[in-house]
């Protein structure tokens, strides 16, 4: 067995394409689908607080709208500083209503009006919780705008006051402060770490209890997502350690919104590197995460697939933790899911398993997933085909001879060769790399493989790639032609024809790693 492993390790060195090694074979999400990198759900992107009808105060809608439209910003600013509590509250409320409008709220106009310091001062008015609530709401909506608008709120020294309001005896004030802090934290790693440094985590987590209203808990969970977001740099290790026990509780919640946000938080943490992946594993949450791959809600499935997909970009040992939770049993349904994005992410996951060790490659084969990958290589949308090409190519690097022979038996060559004409140079290179590996591994059977490549039109495509503008591609195409399709080949010698086995197929040279049933392709 040790000799076989040495041979396989040597083969890895010989067959890997330039720049392809075990580290780069496992591909993180940002290399795979750039547009999905942030993948903020709609409500995350639109950080603005929508205005429920019940939150519009005593005035009738008509009266309130009339007052807002007919009150100049100058008057609002002036009245917001009034000593008369009624006038002051109405002015702050008018500002909040302007900011709550669905169509182009005048955030910049309000910032320029000089109202920010006044609103921030209102946060200190413990004697007037209604004023605190309205001011916090207005500031929340200003912070929901552009990064510059969020920074304006931060620079007005609002954050320490929002943190103070987390201890308010009035729940609506607490909840509004949570929402405001979520918008500020979501602006980026600098704001996130600033708010963390002021001590947001403990009071935030203290809200998680059976008695908390569901809408409030949704807000708290959403802020936790923002705390876990961003990986340049990732959140402080101490913060992750504080948050993980709460995520271990929330992953059992029955509310779909809370569950989705909990799993997205895990996906962001596992996207930050192997150290963070290990922290998530050590929390014991993975056995509760994997079953969510078959959750009835697509939103939950999508988030879970991303989270486990990030974990298997880690080491073989970290990958094995996911496989030990019977993860592969969920993939027949994911590979045939009506949503193409789920197909694509599922194949991306599997491409990182086939980049693993030979036992992990065998697990994919034993789960009968290879024919499904090949089907998507042939019939999937281009994004999914690209992932399938990686999955196949990685298997030709990581797999044993019999495992690669199984690929051939499943008729991988025609759909693999079809991708040689796509415009994406990376895909072409991945396919050429895989074909080269297969041909080298075939040894005495290389001619048989060559015939399969030629019969499906692959040889003609490889010949054309010798003129490709990409240097790596034309060199690899030339090497394949030179080594395996040279016109100097001797005439076919009957004694060299591979022996036919049952079913009219052929066997690889049986000098190493021969399973009892023999090689077949």
Curated annotation (Swiss-Prot):
N-acetylalanine PTM positions: 2
Q: Does the keyword Nucleus apply?
A: yes
One Pfam match, given by its short name, reads: Arm_3
Q: How does it assemble?
A: Forms a complex with importin subunit beta-1 (KPNB1). Interacts with SNAI1. Interacts with TALDO1 isoform 1. Interacts with CYB1.
Chief place where the protein resides: cytoplasm
Which organism is this entry from? Homo sapiens (Human)
Name of the featured protein? Importin subunit alpha-3
Which region ranges are annotated with the description NLS binding site (major)?
A: 137-229
Lineage here is: Eukaryota, Metazoa, Chordata, Craniata, Vertebrata
